Amino acid sequence: MKNILFIVVLFLFLKSSGQNVNEEFDGKKCEAPYVLDTIKGWDVERFLIPISFAPSIPYKGIEDIRFTPGWAKKTTNEYWSYAFLWYLDGTVTLDARTIENNLKAYYTGLIKVNSDSSKIADKLFPVTSSIKPRTTEKEDLKTFEGSVTMLDYMSKQAITLNLVIHIRTCAGKDKTFVFHEISPMPYPDDVWKRLHQLWVNFKCDKK
């Protein structure tokens, strides 16, 4: 995640982007075949799936993240507010239970690589997640909402992140798009409008 160096020396054959199997993946230079806005002031990070800190998540593809400017500033409503897209190979079937398990594995691994467990052992507790379907939004196959409760490795306190998750496929592409909007703020807060606008503006390709 942001402010932590992830050294990824892996190889990926991406038919859609034309990358050669012998090329190193460079998240900064990666040219996505889809459109996910890059907003001035927002940080971007990309890395390969399977995810180094959550190898039990059984997919292949790319994670593409957008961090709000206030992502690491606890005094703002953008603290821990960000979005990420999973651009996955093939048709991936997802239900609420599968998403819950994926999120538990993801955030458990994330905390581990961003924390010195010997110093915060008394604060560690299992990540919990709760996901349910919500009204399916336009162009989504499915839409979900829910929460993750975990240790905030920045403040060393418990935090609950609210989530909205969108599943989409696109004609002519053997890919599954899974877009996560995340914030500890309640849903009426205007930070959700900014996060959701990324998905509203999303396009399956650049044509």
Each model region followed by its residue ranges:
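Bacterial Sec-dependent N-terminal signal peptides
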Residues: M1-F25
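Short, exposed beta-strand/loop patches in secreted or surface proteins that constitute
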Residues: S56-P58, I131-T135, T169
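Second-shell loop/turn segments in exported
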Residues: V35, L88-T98, E181-D189
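Conserved polar/disulfide-associated segments of primarily extracytoplasmic proteins
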Residues: G70-Y153
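Stable alpha-helical elements in mature extracytoplasmic
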Residues: I49, I99-Y106, V191-L198
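Short, solvent-exposed beta-alpha or beta-beta edge segments that form flexible loop/patches at the rim
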Residues: Y59-W71, T75, T160
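Short, well-structured beta-strand
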Residues: K138-K207
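N-terminal "mature-domain start" segment
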Residues: V21-R66
